[in-house]
Amino acid sequence: VMKQAGYVTGSVGKWHLGLGDGAVDWNETVYPGAKEVGYDYSFIQAATNDRVPCIFIENGKGVGLEPNDPLYVSYKHNFPGEPTGKDNPELLRMHPSVGHAGSIVNGVPRIGFQKGGKAAQWKDEDMAELFLEKANKDKPFFLYYGLHQPHVPRVPNQKFVGKSGMGPRGDVILEADWCVTEFLKELDKLGLTENTLVILTSDNGPVLDDGYQDQAVEMVGNHKMAGPHRGGKTSLYDGGTCIPFLLRWPAVVKPGVSDALVC
């Protein structure tokens, strides 16, 4: 729709909308992908932070993959000799609470199993700055920026470690806030602020324990993550389905607050 209206389009960050058609060979061009749904440029995760393969996909190609170390992925079984969160807890810097007992990447156990592609594996702490760099690269008029924070595993950049006083979850929320601020600064620098519509929203309600032992439950205190609502992520209650929807368009939208239901 955006391309038909003449927009240059880009997608950067967390994807989780599916790539490929059935069995995917990650060492070749992954098709279909972001391009096939209308994006001129994409630099995305193959899935989410906590799922294999833990590599970036740029315009359908795995970033940094080397022919002599091909990447193999399975969601059914591990590859012989590859360490996992279940069998090798001594290798972990973050331990799972449920569901994340597969391949270990960057000291964090993931969902699923992967082998090879070592040079292409991401470093969780560096994602925010890398995504911002890619988001600003071509300055697309329509940009979908899927924030990877505060999705699990909650591994903050070193500059945010311990800064919130609320553990890793609080730290990555600070990092997400920084990411949004830096993006808005870029619009200011380009002189695009007044006539650019910025929408900040989410795909689900909040969550504390989302599969890793990161002190989120212990350190939340009296804070009500979903405000007055019951439930959270994965729940059918309002806490799971009511999400923030923030707009900024200085030339058109006047500041204000609305409780209207948007579907």
Place the predicted regions along the sequence by residue.
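Formylglycine-dependent sulfatase
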Residues: 1-263
